[in-house]
Amino acid sequence: MKIRAAVMREKGGPFRIEEVELDEPREDEVLVRIAGAGLCHTDLAARDQLVPSPFPIVLGHEGSGIVEKIGKRVQKVKPGDHVVLSYVACGACGPCRKGMEHICLNSFEYNFMGARPDGSRTMRKGGEKINGSFFGQSSFATHALANERNTVKVDDDVPIERLGPLGCGIQTGAGGVINALSPKPGSSLAVFGTGGVGMSAILAGVLCGCSRIIAVDVKETRLKAARELGATHVIDPRRSDPI
């Protein structure tokens, strides 16, 4: 099918909106019409070749949208479902079998190399192969092919175009607090940097019952937002000694 995608063709270059051809979903794949996508530093790292993803490539790994088609083996979602797309894991290595997909042994190959695990590309333009499958999605496009494993169904009463960051930034910040730190009620939490990940960590601190949540940043607008989200103290290290 023909879609429009933001194609990155060179290191540090611009995103170019181009018409490309996207495969039909394979038996374990899900075709999603993208409603919204977050822009993460990891996308910019791939653009700048801090991670060696191949060009030309369609980036984007915080996508959300509506399922349009599914492969015959897909059971978790159906056409019309609202979904958030996240990273993809192999599902077969030791960590994956223990439910720890976030440390999948094949994570780099599955998320950064621009192709399906079998090496095939999902997109092309004329006779040119376009690398995709970035984090198992490449959501800087009107449509994305994802795997059933990295497609998460969400309620349809929430604006789907706002949910993309759940796939990376929000789960990174909130998950780091809830699952890794696991703070007890009444404990203190310091968050250095209050971008999307840091703000998510603050929200998780509130959820966990932290009595003191300290936000540290050099931008006054972010510190103001951090207070609104639950930070009890804010520090701008340019204006005061954070120690």
Regions found by a protein language model. Name each.
Residues M1-S64, S138-A146, N150-V152:
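Short N-terminal strand-loop motif that marks the start
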Residues I3, D81, G186-S187, S211:
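Nucleotide donor/acceptor-binding cores
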Residues D23-A37, L50-R97, H102, K153-D157:
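Glycine-rich beta-strand-centered segment in the early N-terminal region that forms part
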Residues R33, G60, S86, L166, ...:
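Active-site-adjacent beta-strand anchor residues
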Residues G94-F192:
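NAD(P)H dinucleotide-binding glycine-rich loop of Rossmann-like/cofactor-binding domains
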Residues S188-T194, L203-I243:
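Adenosine-nucleotide cofactor-binding segment
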Residues G198-M199:
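N-terminal Rossmann-fold NAD(P) dinucleotide-binding loop
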